[in-house]
Amino acid sequence: MSKKIAVIGECMIELSEKGADVKRGFGGDTLNTSVYIARQVDPAALTVHYVTALGTDSFSQQMLDAWHGENVDTSLTQRMENRLPGLYYIETDSTGERTFYYWRNEAAAKFWLESEQSAAICEELANFDYLYLSGISLAILSPTSREKLLSLLRECRANGGKVIFDNNYRPRLWASKEETQQVYQQMLECTDIAFLTLDDEDALWGQQPVEDVIARTHNAGVKEVVVKRGADSCLVSIAGEGLVDVPAVKLPKEKVIDTTAAGDSFSAGYLAVRLTGGSAENAAKRGHLTASTVIQYRGAIIPREAMPA
């Protein structure tokens, strides 16, 4: 019987400059991960579900249609009257440096745990094999909704499920660094696999040797710690089994076009192997291969035919 992973988060409308024109697309860290997992697994082994809230507008419908086309199940995605998806604009200067502007305060995804359907959705999610979320999934919620989400994660683990967390830290989404540290600590205490981008760890906790970052995460109760270091090797530490250092795929500088979804796609490649019985080392190799392919194309979601074999 196929196992199930629910990816929890937010997808937004993306507006980006293309010469004198503005191009519209969709983007979101967890959505990127869900698509790249779905592209790399046999649905008979693992089905991918995306959990969020959208509006009843045409943009929301276009998102749903796109996700269906990627074999991402949306049966647990809510549609809310009088709500819309969030929006962000990417401005690119003459050197290629990007600046992001966000409009998301009233986005539907912020309220997915406050609806009449949320209790029934949580009841279903508590029986999933895997729940995946990121720091952004937590940041957009009210404190009350965060508590509900943490309760759901604990219940899922009590039922035999596993929780996967990507530390994706965006300071502008949080009231303070202290609040983030407190929430992340609670999150790690109910996490089985943690993906840590080292730059985000340094920004949130202060710069520390990577060994200390790994030890702190294990001490919170996380069994499997995956440290992402951009173009450098990744480190996988499994409690009781030791550390594996897996080299990245090296690309010539001119082949790197857009690093937008590098971390999201790495996590997807890793999980596509790991959650279907592969070793941590092979999972990390697949993560590197996926990320190194994705960054050779513009945009977060690359053409399906460009995916590695």
Curated annotation (Swiss-Prot):
Catalytic residues identified in the record: 264 (proton acceptor)
Pathway in which this enzyme or protein is active: Carbohydrate acid metabolism; 2-dehydro-3-deoxy-D-gluconate degradation; D-glyceraldehyde 3-phosphate and pyruvate from 2-dehydro-3-deoxy-D-gluconate: step 1/2
SUPFAM superfamilies, sorted: Ribokinase-like
Pfam families: PfkB
pH-dependence annotation: Optimum pH is between 5.6 and 6.
Known catalytic reactions: 2-dehydro-3-deoxy-D-gluconate + ATP = 2-dehydro-3-deoxy-6-phospho-D-gluconate + ADP + H(+)
Single Gene Ontology BP annotation: D-galacturonate catabolic process
InterPro entries assigned to the protein according to its UniProt record, in alphabetical order: Carboh/pur_kinase_PfkB_CS (IPR002173), PfkB_Carbo_kinase (IPR050306), PfkB_dom (IPR011611), Ribokinase-like (IPR029056)
CDD domains named in the record: KdgK (cd01166)
Keywords, comma-separated and alphabetical: ATP-binding, Carbohydrate metabolism, Kinase, Nucleotide-binding, Transferase
EC number in record: 2.7.1.45
An example Gene Ontology CC term for this record: cytosol
Binding of ATP, residues: 168-170, 228-233, 261-264
Any coiled-coil regions, as ranges: none
Gene3D superfamilies given in the database record: 3.40.1190.20
Annotated binding of substrate, by residue: 28-32, 88, 102-104, 170, 264
Gene Ontology molecular functions: 2-dehydro-3-deoxygluconokinase activity; ATP binding; nucleotide binding
First-tier enzyme category under EC: transferase
Superkingdom, taxonomy of origin: Bacteria
Family label: Belongs to the carbohydrate kinase pfkB family.
Role description: Catalyzes the phosphorylation of 2-keto-3-deoxygluconate (KDG) to produce 2-keto-3-deoxy-6-phosphogluconate (KDPG).
UniProt protein name: 2-dehydro-3-deoxygluconokinase
Organism of origin: Escherichia coli (strain ATCC 9637 / CCM 2024 / DSM 1116 / LMG 11080 / NBRC 13500 / NCIMB 8666 / NRRL B-766 / W)
Name of encoding gene: kdgK
